[in-house]
């Protein structure tokens, strides 16, 4: 290999350094790596508190003297047959699709099922006729659901991506779902805890998104969160 790129901003596990030695690439690029670590040919200084994660692409492209246009956008590939399958499924639902994910990588950042029930009631009252699709691959949602609400019937990540790509609105506290929505510039309401390093670095990063910051405590304990989400809803779906 001529160039290897280690895009991680924080971690530097020993097994990765061993992998670099085994591959023996001519050049290894990284971010915020200690000068004493000789496995890297060049390390970019990256300000995780001020910059968005997409700036990593810009720094690499500048260093390699590549065209930087369009580097602020994600490009996710979903197989055509899966996009068609999901399109047919959405066409079978009554109303415009709203994809809701209440789960994050940590329980402190997840919405509660009580919040979900309140959100569904207020969402359907605000936009009657909408169809809500809940992402729940672990099958953890236990609350009774109204007829307009369904659990995602598909089991693959590609299907979840296709749902997000074709939905009218996404609501999520999880940054992986947030950045899937960003790939297709979908209307999004993203819920974040007030963690500076996370809120700027992993922000949605596009104009069609609304970012709600929960200032203190755990997301699932925030009593006024649902009203803030409803207030951020677009007027038309």
PLM regions and their residue ranges:
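Catalytic machinery of carbohydrate-active enzymes
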Residues: 1-237
């Amino acid at each position: 290999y001529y160039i290897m790129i280690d895009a991680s901003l924080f971690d530097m596990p020993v097994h990765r350094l061993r992998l670099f030695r085994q591959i023996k690439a001519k050049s290894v690029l990284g971010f915020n790596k200690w000068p004493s670590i000789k496995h890297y040919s060049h390390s970019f200084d990256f300000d995780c508190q001020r910059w968005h994660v997409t700036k990593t692409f810009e720094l690499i492209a500048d260093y390699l003297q590549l065209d930087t246009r369009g580097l602020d956008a994600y490009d996710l590939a979903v197989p055509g047959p899966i996009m068609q399958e999901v399109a047919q499924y959405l066409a079978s639902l009554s109303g415009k699709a709203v994809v809701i994910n209440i789960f994050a990588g940590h329980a402190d950042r997840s919405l509660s099922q009580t919040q979900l029930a309140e959100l569904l009631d207020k969402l359907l009252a605000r936009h009657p006729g909408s169809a809500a699709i809940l992402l729940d691959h672990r099958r953890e949602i236990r609350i009774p659901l109204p007829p307009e609400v369904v659990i995602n019937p598909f089991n693959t990540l590609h299907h979840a991506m296709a749902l997000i790509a074709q939905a009218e609105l996404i609501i999520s506290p999880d940054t992986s779902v947030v950045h899937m929505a960003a790939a297709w510039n979908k209307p999004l309401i993203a819920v974040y805890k007030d963690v500076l390093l996370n809120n700027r670095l992993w922000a949605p990063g596009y104009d069609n998104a609304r970012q709600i910051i929960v200032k203190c405590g755990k997301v699932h304990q925030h009593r006024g969160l649902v009203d803030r989400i409803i207030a951020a809803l677009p007027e038309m779906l």
